[in-house]
């Protein structure tokens, strides 16, 4: 038995999911914690309720549905494309509202026409909310991590810095801190003077030998930790990242991109103009962006209600492209949110790459909005 009452519109919502070709899937409330800790992002990791089995396995109360639905799909070895629907309780530590609440949504797995699948996810989220909140105008905020990644990859940064920036996408405070760091070279702090001297001289063999001796003297086993060679490689990367500086023109370029915010109907032209003026090629990322807008138009979605913000992301690490959120016009509470997560199923154990997109509905917030 659930500890809180299911929303009174749950039955109608499940019927709507079925009409949209999404089959309901149930997943256990108790989940293995590792996938969420590894892939869900720092914001969600802080909110997870963790526990442990008698055998020492790390477990958690289900904090969201995307990872459990994907694990269920892999476990049952069903074919694709497949549309799944879910409705149930999730558990998160929250500053406002209860720690236990209902979410529902659709996960679209294996649809090769990614632009069409993206558009369908946005259209479904809007359509469902219009049914649940008739006559209430909605706004949509849209971002695209693939476009951001394409811009970052043109800057000539080391791969470690590229990863840092991409992982910070959507977290404006963290991203701004990284850009400030890139504006002026830093020094690597906390290094042993001997290690620092060997790194500065470029004597890799000497560094490995020094680390090997240190590990032997302190009793560290290479079987239980990284080898001296692996540690040396990480230290070299740490030093390179600390000393990396992004020149003023490139930094200005990145900040200019992140400042873009405009109606979605104008976004393709704005991105193409930005790329041309900067001498960049955004390639497949821009092509996919344009194809998604065309697919939205084909579905009759009102593009004037959608805003593209280049810096907009969602606080989950598994997103790879489209990200979006839907709210009532003039309000900040997110009623629906989702995006594309093409790498997630492979990371969870799928044998082949499975393109995927989906969205979740915050039923407690929708219930409050219906009551007003």
From Swiss-Prot:
One of its GO terms (cellular component) is cytoplasm. GO terms for molecular function: histidine-tRNA ligase activity. Pathway: Amino-acid biosynthesis; L-histidine biosynthesis; L-histidine from 5-phospho-alpha-D-ribose 1-diphosphate: step 1/9. InterPro entries: aa-tRNA-synth_II, aa-tRNA-synth_II/BPL/LPL, HisRS-like_core, HisRS/HisZ, HisZ. Gene3D superfamilies: Bira Bifunctional Protein, Domain 2 (3.30.930.10). It is found in: Cytoplasm. Its main location: cytoplasm. One of its GO terms (biological process) is histidyl-tRNA aminoacylation. Keywords: Amino-acid biosynthesis, Cytoplasm, Histidine biosynthesis. Coiled coil: none annotated. It holds the Pfam family tRNA-synt_His. The keyword NADP does not apply. Required for the first step of histidine biosynthesis. May allow the feedback regulation of ATP phosphoribosyltransferase activity by histidine. Heteromultimer composed of HisG and HisZ subunits. This function is generally fulfilled by the C-terminal part of HisG, which is missing in some bacteria such as this one. Belongs to the class-II aminoacyl-tRNA synthetase family. HisZ subfamily. This is ATP phosphoribosyltransferase regulatory subunit. It comes from Allorhizobium ampelinum (strain ATCC BAA-846 / DSM 112012 / S4) (Agrobacterium vitis (strain S4)).
